[in-house]
């Protein structure tokens, strides 16, 4: 979005966002992450520059995935949101849905929640025709397999020759007692 706005600090500029309350909550979260970050590149920035914040692409590296999702959802300019979604061969509602699913999945993993046979409360959206087919329409959208398919979809889009399928297969082989059908 920095490229479209010509503003390397767009992420902290309220003019680009639709909901002021959501923007203010986002800024509080950004402040917390920035002020407590121990990342070398953030420490270098603080010691080298006078700006209150680093450029948006640096902030994006330290803020939680859920905050990135809310930033995307709050972008005022729908054309920019559409352009970002099209980078992943998706439309806006599907990208928002999938970002939320990935965030929930990530949070469950980080908090050691059981995920392999869990039924999620969220029902992810699915587009009719995928440019990069991976997810079938008969898959239960509330199970971890669908979340893994979404992650694999993004991996295939960003890093086409990734080894996620191999690693997942190895993981499942390591734990043969897991009922794959429950996923």
Language-model segments: residues:
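Long, contiguous internal "core" modules enriched in hydrophobic/ aromatic residues
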Residues: 1-183
């Amino acid at each position: 979005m920095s490229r479209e706005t010509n503003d390397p600090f767009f992420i902290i500029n309220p003019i680009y966002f639709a909901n002021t309350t959501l923007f203010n909550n986002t800024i509080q979260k950004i402040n917390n992450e920035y002020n407590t970050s121990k990342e070398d590149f953030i420490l270098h920035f603080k010691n080298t520059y006078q700006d209150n914040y680093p450029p948006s692409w640096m902030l994006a590296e330290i803020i939680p995935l859920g905050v990135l999702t809310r930033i995307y959802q709050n972008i005022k300019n729908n054309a920019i949101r559409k352009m970002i979604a099209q980078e992943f061969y998706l439309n806006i509602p599907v990208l928002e849905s999938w970002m939320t699913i990935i965030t929930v999945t990530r949070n469950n993993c980080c908090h050691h929640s059981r995920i392999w046979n869990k039924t999620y409360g969220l029902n992810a959206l699915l587009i009719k025709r995928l440019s990069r087919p991976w997810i079938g329409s008969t898959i239960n959208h509330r199970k971890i397999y669908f979340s893994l398919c979404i992650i694999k979809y993004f991996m295939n889009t960003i890093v086409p020759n990734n080894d996620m399928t191999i690693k997942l297969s190895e993981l499942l082989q390591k734990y043969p007692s897991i009922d794959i059908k429950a996923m």
